[in-house]
Swiss-Prot record:
Organism of derivation: Roseobacter denitrificans (strain ATCC 33942 / OCh 114) (Erythrobacter sp. (strain OCh 114))
Single GO term (MF): ATP binding
Record-linked Pfam families: ATP-synt_DE_N
Keywords of this entry: ATP synthesis, Cell inner membrane, Cell membrane, CF(1), Hydrogen ion transport, Ion transport, Membrane, Transport
Gene assigned in the entry: atpC
Main location: membrane
Subcellular compartments: Cell inner membrane
Protein name according to UniProt: ATP synthase epsilon chain
Amino acid sequence: MADTVQFDLVSPERLLASGQVTAVQIPGADGDMTAMAEHAPTITTLRPGLLVTEGPDGTSEYVVTGGFAEITASSISVLAERAIPKAEVTKADHDAMVKEAEEALVKAKEAFANEPGPVDDAAKMLADMVAVGDHITL
């Protein structure tokens, strides 16, 4: 199939997905993007969000919390800090991720009191993490 690309989703713990897909919706740090066959070469960082693949075998959804994606004309590789199939995410999992983001914000405020950049980044991470829960209806 000329309309498919090789897709790989890897987290530090395991390979979550590998196969041919027609499209991948990626929660990029600069906004959501859809990558398909013949996409221009791109590397983007991920924000917490829902990564969705579409392919011959149907649609798959994964919650990711960060990392990066490398996109070429023939492949899409996502290296995620944390990735969990959406169907496996529990409220307790999400609550733990939000708590971790809240703690990171507190630490950023303490360490960078007069530097808004790192504090803003941590606040955005927390907001994105909360939005993930709203998006997947936990």
